[in-house]
Design a protein with these regions (language model features):
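RNA pseudouridine synthases
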Residues: 1-151, 158-163, 233, 241-250
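Pseudouridine synthase
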Residues: 46-53, 164-227, 246
């Protein structure tokens, strides 16, 4: 992976650039609490991924550098605001279209890590659930129902000793539904620590008191895909380490 000379991205102050390749592929390490894209009004906001205007019709951010030159960042997928980790975009619409096709065809290999409750009855392996979206008091909620099939391969990596009974798990989803991993964990009674919608609220408060950790402990840690552009095969891989506060739980 090579970084190339590029205009400075007007990134959220807690996010950072991981890669900007000659092919136009851009990878950003998004901080927890940052929106992948703005709310419908499209206005600049300190909680947005980029401090720039967002053009909804073209799914891109646009800004002008000090020399008066206009630049764009085309968003290729999204992460929930509470989730941290790798988010992919492109500096040009052609590359963005190719990447979006890979996401749509489920040809992107994604790996997440999460800290969850420990439940001896929960099983690792291949998780399959049918989930539906609902509106409850105007807020989006996802639950088991007669909806799209959601799949993920899951491994339990490490258990923390102590009364909180926490564990680190790896999740590799082959589908990308809204709130999918959070709900799949909740359905197996191992909710993700810090989840303020589907979580164990008592445990969340306890972890916050003990570790000062007040966020969803879900991190997009690895992404891999290939695209063919102008006859050339381009393979892209990117990693993002666990945020320090999450990693400290197991040290």
């Amino acid at each position: 992976m090579n970084l190339i000379a590029q205009p400075e991205l007007p990134l959220d102050k807690n996010s950072q650039l991981l890669a900007w390749e000659e092919s136009g592929i851009i990878a950003i390490d998004k901080a927890a609490g940052v929106l992948s894209h703005p709310n419908p009004n499209g206005k600049r906001n300190s909680r947005n991924l980029l401090l720039a205007d967002y053009i909804s019709e073209e799914e891109c951010y646009e800004w002008m550098d000090p020399k008066g030159q206009t630049h764009r960042f085309y968003l290729c997928h999204r992460l929930d605001s509470p989730t941290s980790g790798i988010i992919i975009g492109s500096s040009d619409s052609e590359t963005a279209t190719l990447i979006k096709e890979k996401f749509a065809n489920r040809e992107v290999r994604k790996t997440y890590h999460a800290v969850t409750c420990f439940n001896p009855k929960a099983k690792e392996g291949h998780w399959v659930d049918r989930l539906i979206e609902k509106r409850v008091d105007g807020k989006l909620r996802v639950e088991r129902g007669n909806g799209p099939t959601c799949k993920a391969n899951v491994r339990f990596l490490r258990k923390k000793k102590g009364e909180n009974h926490l564990q680190l798990i790896e999740l590799r989803p082959s589908t990308g539904r809204t709130h999918q991993l959070r709900v799949q964990c909740m359905l197996r009674k191992i909710p993700i620590v810090g989840d303020k919608t589907y979580g164990d609220f008592s445990l969340n408060r306890k972890v916050k008191r003990e570790s000062k950790l007040d966020r969803l402990c879900l991190h997009a840690s690895n992404i891999e895909f290939s695209i063919r552009k102008k006859g050339q095969e381009i393979n892209f891989t990117c990693e993002s380490p666990l945020p320090r506060l999450i990693g400290k739980i197991f040290t």
